[in-house]
Amino acid sequence: LSAPPKLTLKTMANLATKWSWGIGMLGAKRRGFGNIVGHVKGISDTSSLGSWTAEQFDPSLDWDKIAKLKEQWGGKVILKGILDAEDAKMALKVGADAIIVSNHGGRQLDGALSSIRVLPSILEAVGDQIDVHLDSGIRSGQDVLKAMAMGAKGTYIGRAYIYGLGAMGEAGVTSALNIIHRELDTTMALCGETNVEDLGRHNLLVPKDFEGRWQEYVGAGNA
């Protein structure tokens, strides 16, 4: 996956067999990132967008730079992408105000640990010294309840509202959020709870080896 796409002989030969699709695309509106192209200085097409995007990533980013960013910013800093207890401790050490336990969505590796499976070890590592939130896999109100009952202070969604956006635009996003809210409300009622602050492990049936199995596997892999 690259931008702009590179035309090869194989690609061109493949396109030649899709001539009807090609004709249709000639009359279609050119697609791009509407919130960037035309709004960010110097970004006018896919090619310049690709170069600009590459410039936004700093491969030398480390914990010391996050601490300096916190100092220069002067506001609250929330770190997303924490999937390990040691990283959670480092986030606390460099001054993060909150962390989001989150995996990478499959864009870097084909697989990763689920965020809710590592949540207990992260909470144990940092306690209540820092707010711990969670995303990755939140698709329903029941998912929200599970995460908060496990100890997360809050949850985030992405794909859930994107589905609504794709189907019905702004109204679809509102509908998706309302559905999740109703599901959470219903699940809480069936659990006998009226306040999210009262949610806890007593609302869940968590297997004793829920976390232990992956820790054992990781330990064996590092031996």
List each language-model region with its residue ranges:
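Short beta->alpha connector loops at strand-helix junctions that form conserved
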Residues: 80-81, 102-103, 136, 158-159
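Active-site entrance/lid segments in N-terminal catalytic domains of soluble metabolic enzymes
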Residues: 1-93, 105-108
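Alpha/beta catalytic cores of nucleotide-metabolism and tRNA/nucleoside-modifying enzymes
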Residues: 32, 117-135, 139-223
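Short, well-ordered secondary-structure micro-motifs
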Residues: 89-90, 110-112, 144-146, 167
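Glycine-enriched alpha-helix->loop->beta-strand junction motifs that scaffold or abut catalytic
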Residues: 72-76, 92-106, 126-129, 151-155
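Glycine-rich, proline-tolerant flexible connector loops at the mouths of alpha/beta enzymes
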Residues: 50, 103-113, 162-165
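Short loop-to-alpha-helix "cap/lid" segments that border enzyme active sites
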Residues: 61-66, 71, 113-127
